[in-house]
Every structure is written in structure tokens, then in C-alpha cells.
């Protein structure tokens, strides 16, 4: 019931001003038809969310002025296209914060990003009288990677944690990308490989329970299970999990089946 539209792109080559310019002509679409189909989905109770970031469009706010442009440009897109929310999918260059901490941020660019998201949500509520949906789709490196002494802080491991912690009351769903990942630690300090029940269970439990991050990064308090999704690819690739394995894993995660691997909840 939630449709993600990817991605908002850079406007004028600036990484803090965003635009939405789909290549409609490639697919026989027009902006009018796109908006009409969005409206139809919304009339059926579905939500359509604009995804921001991705590997192709890094976003970094280096100054107060850039934050203001960022907030304004996204607000304009929400109004023009009638999206129900935003998905924060920052990757790579967008997360190269320096000397950050979970509770005190540290890097002014991280502070601007958190403040900017809060302002976007506040402005949307004032204009529309309802909450803007907020989801996030970080890579494992920037969440559970916060438990790795090797990744924190020299490789920006855990860089998403300050944002998740600061915005936890506003986040509607966190979908960590449990794919395209190297081995990652669980709460038991053991490392698990993707495409396995243990990987899915260990990394999902860490997000729900919270953890003390490595190298004095701070404490991540976790999110309610109702706000935690399991982000997996539906086609074969790096991190693909066979359907039968996934079904058994999810049943155990939900308390409806036996333990499918070595990791015990």
C-alpha cells in the first residue's frame, strides 16, 4: 500500500537543491497522466512517497543557506506532485560526516540535514493539516555498521544513527537495505553474511533493541518493531534470499515458527 518513487534529482547540478524530472517520454507517459495515476492510487488509500538520495544523487548541506534551499525545493515538489511523504535514502558521499556522535551530531552538515527534515515536515503539516510520512532506507554500513570498530569512525560506519535517533518519533518506517552488504555484526558481536536467516534476524533485532555503538559513538535506543521493515531485493542479486528461506525467517521473527538458523532471538 506504499509506493516509492525514485528519485528526486539534483537541480542545476547542486547537491542541495532537488528536482523531480522523470523521463516520461521513454515510457509513453506524461506528467498529467502520472499525476492522474497517483491520484487514483491515493483514492484507493495507498500512499505515494518521493525518495531522496540514492547512489546517483548525493545530497549534502554545507551551510544554513543550502539547508533553506533544500527545504524549499522539497516543499515545492511535495506541493506540485502531491506526494504523501519522503523517503531518505542517503548513500556514499551524502554520509561523509566528520566527528559525529549519535546524541550530539558533531558535524554541522548532519545538523543541517536533521533540522531540514524537521522543517519540511512542519511546513507540510501547516499547509496540509496532516503528517508527512517519513521513511528511511539506509545501507547496513551506516546503521548496524555502527557496532563495528573497523567502520567507526574512519569509514563513516553508523552515520545514519544520529538521524534515526533524532527523528525516531517522526519516522513511520525504517527499511535497512539487507543486501549489497558485507558481513555485519549482531548484538552478540558475531558477524553474519547476507542472504541467510541469521543475517536478517541479527540485523533486524539490532534495530529494534538498539545498541551501544563502537568507539564512543554513543547509544542508539532502537525503534518499535512496528516501525521496522526488512528491506530485501525481489530479484536475484547480491543479497537475494530464497523465498522458502525468507518465509521461514519471517515466521520465526514474528514468533510464528521454529528457529531457522543459528541466531536465536
Which sequence ranges carry the predicted segments?
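Short glycine-rich, acidic/polar surface loops and turns
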Residues: 249-253
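Chitinase-like catalytic core of GlcNAc-active glycosidases
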Residues: 1-207, 213-214, 221-247, 260
Amino acid at each position: 500500500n506504499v509506493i516509492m518513487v525514485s528519485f528526486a534529482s539534483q537541480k542545476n547540478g547542486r547537491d542541495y537543491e532537488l528536482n523531480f524530472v522523470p523521463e516520461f517520454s521513454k515510457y509513453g507517459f506524461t506528467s498529467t497522466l502520472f499525476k492522474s495515476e497517483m491520484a487514483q492510487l491515493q483514492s484507493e488509500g495507498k500512499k505515494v512517497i518521493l525518495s531522496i538520495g540514492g547512489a546517483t544523487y548525493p545530497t549534502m548541506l554545507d551551510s544554513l543557506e543550502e539547508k533553506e534551499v533544500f527545504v524549499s525545493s522539497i516543499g515545492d515538489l511535495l506541493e506540485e506532485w502531491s506526494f504523501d511523504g519522503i523517503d531518505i535514502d542517503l548513500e556514499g558521499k551524502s554520509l561523509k560526516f566528520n566527528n559525529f556522535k549519535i546524541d550530539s551530531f558533531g558535524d554541522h552538515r548532519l545538523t543541517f540535514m536533521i533540522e531540514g527534515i524537521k522543517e519540511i515536515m512542519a511546513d507540510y503539516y501547516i499547509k496540509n493539516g496532516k503528517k508527512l510520512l517519513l521513511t528511511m532506507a539506509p545501507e547496513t554500513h551506516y546503521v548496524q555498521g555502527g557496532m563495528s570498530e573497523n567502520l567507526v569512525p574512519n569509514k563513516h560506519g553508523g552515520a545514519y544513527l544520529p538521524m534515526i535517533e533524532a527523528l525516531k518519533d517522526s519516522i513511520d518506517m525504517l527499511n535497512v537495505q539487507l543486501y549489497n552488504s558485507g558481513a555485519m555484526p549482531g548484538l552478540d558481536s558475531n558477524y553474519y553474511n547476507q542472504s541467510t536467516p541469521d543475517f536478517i534476524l541479527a540485523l533486524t533485532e539490532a534495530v529494534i533493541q538498539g545498541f551501544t555503538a563502537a568507539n564512543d559513538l554513543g547509544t542508539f535506543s532502537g525503534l518499535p518493531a512496528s516501525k521496522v521493515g526488512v528491506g530485501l531485493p525481489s530479484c536475484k542479486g547480491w543479497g537475494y534470499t530464497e523465498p522458502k528461506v525468507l518465509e521461514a525467517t519471517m515466521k520465526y521473527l514474528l514468533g510464528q515458527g521454529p528457529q531457522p538458523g543459528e541466531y536465536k532471538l
